[in-house]
Amino acid sequence: MNIKILKILVGGLFFLSLNAHLWGKQDNSFLGIGERAYKSGNYSKAASYFKKACNDGVSEGCTQLGIIYENGQGTRIDYKKALEYYKTACQADDREGCFGLGGLYDEGLGTAQNYQEAIDAYAKACVLKHPESCYNLGIIYDRKIKGNAAQAVTYYQKSCNFDMAKGCYILGTAYEKGFLEVKQSNHKAVIYYLKACRLNEGQACRALGSLFENGDAGLDEDFEVAFDYLQKACALNNSGGCASLGSMYMLGRYVKKDPQKAFNYFKQACDMGSAVSCSRMGFMYSQGDTVSKDLRKALDNYERGCDMGDEVGCFALAGMYYNMKDKENAIMIYDKGCKLGMKQACENLTKLRGY
């Protein structure tokens, strides 16, 4: 889950922000010794010294203990102990402790799920300028407690102000689509997408590419700018960016036609979960113009696309099964393509069923 992954990263890097070196001298406080033990992977020793620090009123030690117990580092996972230590740290105004506490209430770990308690903890951390907590408040008001769109926008904005790329991206999407009760504005969408893309949010770079490609950014169409943003999106492992580049090279749209480059981008996108790109690879293998003709690979890639919800992939896959005299699988896959909204799949399904 995203919150837990984020906390593991926080745990791994936490000591870096707490380094208490002075004039090159080693920090021999309980916290300092604990940090060095944690860094070296000696979690039992780290926990021992973090506990001493926590007992001495050093809130960072309490937070680090919470992280250790939550993630089961050198000990079994114990969410109740994690909750206890996060709560102690948060009461001492430690923002990471409040963030950890909010996460446990948010997820219902070690306690009953309680959005109000999560909100209280995240809100305190947000006031203490913790970007992820502001963002998580936005998520709660946006997706978990309905009817709070204005609050969601407020906290997404705070997270964006603290350079949380995902918060900026969501605001960009809200303004582009008119979500969260904001007035639709491509101009504002571009502003938020630009910041998110600068902060290496691939989805935002992809969105910018689309806006500039289609001339929807309040500016004239600018294919060079669109191409640059799509390249950045792809480099940031955004499947949509890679898929769009593949389409450009396949069709020779705004760039010199290059089927091999198209195939390479489709493969990248497919491996990142782009259903359409998997289906396009299937087509290229079935034709054999760019890569060696390989019907087995064509079938496999159509199947990947279909499994991920691409109706064209399902239609092509069903056709291959039909040509292989496998009527049962052809019917099953045409049925799936039909349910995904492909009219021709519905027509073929009716013919095969004989009614």
UniProtKB/Swiss-Prot annotation:
GO MF, one example: beta-lactamase activity
Record's keyword terms, sorted: Antibiotic resistance, Disulfide bond, Hydrolase, Repeat, Secreted, Signal, TPR repeat
GO biological process, one term: response to antibiotic
Major localisation: secreted
Domain of life: Bacteria
Subcellular location(s) per record: Secreted
Top EC class, one word: hydrolase
Residues in the signal sequence: 1-22
Name of protein: Putative beta-lactamase HcpE
